[in-house]
Amino acid sequence: MRVDLLTREYPPDVYGGAGVHVEYLARELRRLTDTRVRCFGAPRPEEGVAAYRVPGGLETANAALQVLGVDLEMAAGCEGADLVHSHTWYANFAGHVAKMLYGTPHVVTTHSLEPLRPWKAEQLGGGYTLSSWAERGALAAADAVIAVSEGMRRDMLASYPEISPERVTVIHNGIDTGEYAPDRDTGVLERHGIDPSRPYVVFVGRITRQKGLVHLLHAARGFHPDAQLVLCAGAPDTPEIAAEVTALVRGLDREGVVWISEMLPRPEVIQILTHATVFVCPSVYEPMGIVNLEAMACETAVVATATGGIPEVVADGSTGLLVPIDQAADGTPHDPDAFAADLAERVNRLLADPALAARMGEAGRIRAVEHFSWERIAERTMELYRRVARGEAPVPAG
């Protein structure tokens, strides 16, 4: 069976969890079947990977139009595939067109949902309407839909009631615990100005409304003064949020704030995660949150928002602490001050008890190893492909 994975992100251009997912899923699927990858951007040297640039004439168009232009070329390349599997709205339209054009079965993995990310209008303008349209059409017509968490499945069926529950199955994201493992060296820390002899709180993520960095920076005013704050944060969605975050960082009245804005190589991130006392995930929308698994695999305690699929990853009181959030329709907290205070309280609880933080970190790695292996995820995905190819229901009866 030839499977074409359709994605915006693929190494070396990986910015978020969806890109990480496709990278590792492709690696494991290649052991099981003929797997091709079709991605955005510059050509890749890897065999079996085709990349597509924005078509000529669309260079100055709205970003959403550029995406749809790439998708049309990507769909043309899918001729001959036995099944196409698209990831995120950026590639959903390509899979949808390939299904219509060639009759190829189409599987969609939902890593997020456009109706639950209204702040994307700040980035895409009117293109947000296009992204929502592309996602809805692909999901409605797909032969099978994979949700990366039970929370995502619930959100999807609520957002798109036209989707039959029998077509939606849950297959979690995973983690390579051989690669993501504790690194006790400190050279990376010292090079970036992090004092390895002092405790620190770390955030790793893009500067977006979704990732909640603004809320973390408000909470940081209440962190224990002895703790460093390390922000591995870049790729802002808009100039406006970049300016807001910059002002908040400058306004922190504390020493030991380290802001690394460039994208770091994975081994450097692993070392930074390893030595942190606490990893913080303040997201207001997170269908799964691979980054929490990455921290857990590095034996680091996690403080994360109790939203989306995060509670399926972070075991509250065992591998970390969850922060309750009372959310508005757009995901933002009704009471931002209370959310920031609760975030600070849980971070400080672990800073004050490093032995507890260490125990949670150890439990987190065990959980990551036992429940989130990419090998098992690829096997379950392959089982779904076979069912779809045979024309069977994606979710077995009973």
Identify the meaning behind each predicted range:
Residues V284:
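Aromatic "clamp/platform" in nucleotide-sugar-dependent glycosyltransferases that forms part
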Residues A301-A304, V314:
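Short hydrophobic beta-strand element within catalytic cores of glycosyltransferases
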Residues G151, G174:
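Carbohydrate-associated surface elements
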Residues T104-P105, P115-G137, R154:
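Nucleotide-sugar donor phosphate/pyrophosphate-binding loop at the beta->alpha transition
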Residues A42-P43, I175, Q228-T246:
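Glycosyltransferase donor-sugar binding loop
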Residues S86-A91, T110:
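Short His-centered aromatic/hydrophobic patch
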Residues A242-P267:
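Nucleotide-activated donor-binding/catalytic signature segment of Leloir-type glycosyltransferases, i.e.
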Residues V20, P199, F203-G222, A243:
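A conserved mid-protein helix/loop that constitutes part of the nucleotide-sugar donor-binding site
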